[in-house]
């Protein structure tokens, strides 16, 4: 019916923030006191807005507006972190596998010789 409301608040999950793109389809929950009041619950997948991956045991979180630009993806026991650049800022970083572990400081010391 082409009706338009004033700006609506956006529901967050655990204080995360990712505003939908202008023109994106969103689910709006209208309050019982009138259709002008409501909350934007978020975007949803549909035939024109499909998820980049799907399947049993797949978890993916896109972090940028462009799908595939930056994301976390978990499937089959493997976590993929994809981004144009990644910065780890910590007092200690350890890489660990079944065969052993090494800290970032040890790697840097080895490179410096």
Task: Briefly describe each language-model feature range.
Residues 1-5, 71-74:
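Short intrinsically disordered, low-complexity coil segments enriched in acidic
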Residues 17-25, 30-113:
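Right-handed beta-helix
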Residues 2-18:
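Beta-strand/loop nucleic-acid-binding surfaces
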